[in-house]
Amino acid sequence: CAQRVLRPSINQATIQVLQENGVEVVAVPEQACCGALNLHAGDKEGAQDLARKNLKAFRDVDYVVTNAAGCGSGMKEYPLLFLGEPEEEEAQALAAKVKDLSVLLDELGFTPPPPPRRPLRVAYHDACHLAHAQGVREAPRRLLQAAGLEVLEPREWELCCGSAGTYNLFQPEIAEALGKRKAENLKATGADLVATGNIGCLTQIQAYLDLPVLHTAELLAPLYEGKDPRA
């Protein structure tokens, strides 16, 4: 939900990359917020109300592709949200269909874009909700490498950037310290830009880093058109 306002280009780039890989993209108008922020705030009933809308909205699609790690993690936890309740089985079915963009492309057999005209060094930041909550680390790296990009690993890759859902709102001082530390580690790689898979991380890191910070989809999409992602 925040991504549509803060960085709508991520959604546009995601659609483009999926279509370049032969995926029919269907925008389901009945979908709702995933409910993750409700859960962060302790509002379980509100999260369940939103989740029920999504259980119904996504019944007839093959996959639910997410380009925000926090949302993907939240939807994959629907079975826990409905544990012991009538919706549990349907929640399990939906959770199995939820895939991060990088995972779906990696599983389908990624058709990479032409490599950049100039060498491009990319530091990859692992979003906690992708690497830790979903166990996804290698898929986005494989996509970037297949596109001819040099992927650099920062120190303390496992460290949170300080965004953490609503954590940066309620613990701003600690969040700032984490954000600056993460930015320093990414800068130290000597990269031309940073790639990540979550809008919260992207926004947080960009506040403390003087390098472009892009979503993986934003990095790949221009390459299909022969353009420089830094432009």
Language-model regions, residue ranges each:
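Iron-sulfur cluster-binding electron-transfer modules in prokaryotic oxidoreductases
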Residues: 1-231
